[in-house]
Amino acid sequence: MPKLILCRHGQSEWNAKNLFTGWADVKLSKQGIEEAQSAGKKIYDNQIEIDIAFTSLLTRALETTQYILAGSDQQWIPVYKSWRLNERHYGGLQGLNKDDARKKWGEDQVHQWRRSYDVRPPRESEEQREAYLKNRRYQHIDHRMMPYCESLKDTLERVVPFWTDHISQHLLDDKTVLVSAHGNSIRALIKYLEGLSEEDIVGYEIKTGAPLVYELTDDLVVKDKYYL
């Protein structure tokens, strides 16, 4: 039976500081490390054998993947990394304190940027974009595909092709797949997998460092889901 494990990275240093993160590359906090280690132990205790893992290019997800595989004694399995699993790009909000943003733009506007389906936040500056374009981890990507900012809809539109071309192919081979990613890239996968409405998915909360297991039929219809 195909099995998919979705796990949002553990708490990051910027999560702890209440900052918009997006594509900014930050490490796990002490709490985040403990969450990721706990996720690995839960997988180990439940005797789940992972065949392959997918993660993003951002350090907090990469670290979470490493801690999960170490904690479940499966560090040797193949791990594939893709920018398509990166967090939603928060554009000009990245690095700002969320409370300060509410004071500047108002509670309603910030809520709309964070929790609507197809509304984008302000674009990042040209200086910020130039820094991404020069970053080695993105040199292999067509720069025309690099976002200035993203809505959840935009995030889904880059995540789903990666699901179709890569992740789902291993599930169709009856494998157990780990996806260690981010709140919004996981939210996009859940919307697609469960067929949720735009209204339902924007309010869907994703816990940090908590493995969410999907048991699937042979044609990848959700049979059961549960947190470990």
From Swiss-Prot:
PROSITE patterns found in the cross-reference section: PG_MUTASE (PS00175)
Catalytic activity: (2R)-2-phosphoglycerate = (2R)-3-phosphoglycerate
Single GO BP term: gluconeogenesis
GO molecular function, one term: phosphoglycerate mutase activity
InterPro entries, alphabetized: His_Pase_superF_clade-1, His_PPase_superfam, PG/BPGM_mutase_AS, Phosphogly_mut1
Swiss-Prot/TrEMBL keywords: Gluconeogenesis, Glycolysis, Isomerase
Top EC category: isomerase
Active-site residues (renumbered): 9, 87
Official protein name in the record: 2,3-bisphosphoglycerate-dependent phosphoglycerate mutase
Pathway(s) this gene product operates in, as recorded in its UniProt entry: Carbohydrate degradation; glycolysis; pyruvate from D-glyceraldehyde 3-phosphate: step 3/5
PANTHER family reported for this sequence: PHOSPHOGLYCERATE MUTASE
EC number: 5.4.2.11
Function: Catalyzes the interconversion of 2-phosphoglycerate and 3-phosphoglycerate.
Source organism of the structure: Staphylococcus epidermidis (strain ATCC 12228 / FDA PCI 1200)
CDD domains: HP_PGM_like
